[in-house]
């Protein structure tokens, strides 16, 4: 069991791909999500690939629910594979519940690395009703990027009702399995984002949430090519290629879970 952080998003990683290594890992691996460090946002479990990738990634949220994809987790897995010498200079191919994703190394640093993860194409979702809270109606866009996301525009994300509204929207009729809710604001000439993640709550960063916010900005004509999103855990960049695929760029590093704050405070 090893600890990794992607832009402040913390994960426990367990590699079960090799039979002998898998047995040793399983002996030390958390029996359930409740056994992971309280400060971890989820568990990244590597198992043998099914269709020729370097690994298959199974993502479990803090509450035990399954996530189809995770941009910050993908970069952490990519760093792990690069550090083990499994990839070399090529991009890692990682199978997820949302399909195959690629991760490539941008540059190394003393405290970690910057990596670029392919996030697939965004699929817009029509909302059946407006999003309102305490008499305020929000400008909202919904999108699927492996996981469902709802992006709300706010004047100042620091004052947004993230916990209250994020929790209430988990029962929104358009998202029967829950939804990640982003609160996006333009402040100090930067885009700032807070995300209430389904199965976790508010986190220091959400990679697919940053991609959803960048997509919403592009649809609104306020972003193109590359969009930078500032979150509590750091800055993430989202690129669009001509085919419409999104790429998430940000840091990843290995950390000792024993040194993580527990329980973790709000971002």
Whereabouts are the PLM-identified features?
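Short amphipathic alpha-helix segments
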Residues: 126-130
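Ligand-binding beta-strand-loop-alpha-helix segment within the catalytic cores
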Residues: 121-125
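Short, solvent-exposed secondary-structure boundary/capping segments
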Residues: 111-119
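Internal active-site segments that recognize and position negatively charged phosphoryl groups
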Residues: 132-159
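A glycine-rich beta-to-alpha transition motif near the start of alpha/beta enzyme domains, typified by
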Residues: 1-111, 151-267
